[in-house]
């Protein structure tokens, strides 16, 4: 299965952005703080071990995440930095094969392939076969051969 990609959304999938108090007013005020403060939604030690196993088996592990709907160039840069830092803090041992942080609303099925874990039903519907809800991440990774 070489080069088969396993893609993870961040917000609402591995990072609990929507549980950060006042996240929406902060994003609307061009404040990237919620992206940095979001708590992990998984046991990150176990998740990292399974990602390493996937890579040893020949799979690529990737991030495909949107920027904020509230957007300008400076804010997009700040959000990108916050998301990259979040990954370094919570998954420091993972060497991602690809990280795509793209404009809000970018059709993910047009910029990535393989499987997708995403909390947004529309993204999963557009992706088609191989799209999963976040609650299926660990079971999927444990089943890789």
Q: How should these model regions be labeled?
A:
Residues 73-74, 107-115, 142-143:
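Short, solvent-exposed polar/charged micro-motifs at secondary-structure junctions
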Residues 57-58, 88-98, 128-134:
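Structural alpha-beta junctions
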Residues 5-7, 11-86, 90:
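Alpha-helical substrate-recognition element adjacent to the catalytic core
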Residues 84, 93-114:
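Donor nucleotide-activated moiety binding/catalytic core segment of transferases
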Residues 114-145:
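Acidic, Mg2+-coordinating phosphoryl-transfer loop and its flanking beta/alpha structural elements
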């Amino acid at each position: 299965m070489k080069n088969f990609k396993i893609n993870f959304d961040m917000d609402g999938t591995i990072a609990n952005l929507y549980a950060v108090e006042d996240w929406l007013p902060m994003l609307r005020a061009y404040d990237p703080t919620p992206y940095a403060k979001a708590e992990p939604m998984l046991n990150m030690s176990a998740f990292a071990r399974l990602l390493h196993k996937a890579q040893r088996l020949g799979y690529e592990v990737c991030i495909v995440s949107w920027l904020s709907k509230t957007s300008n160039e400076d804010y997009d840069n700040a959000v990108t930095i916050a998301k990259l830092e979040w990954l370094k803090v919570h998954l420091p041992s993972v060497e991602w094969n690809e990280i795509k942080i793209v404009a809000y609303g970018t059709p993910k099925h047009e910029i990535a392939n393989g499987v997708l874990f995403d909390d947004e039903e529309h993204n999963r519907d557009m992706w088609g076969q191989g799209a999963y809800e976040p609650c299926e991440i660990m079971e999927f990774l444990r089943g890789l051969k």
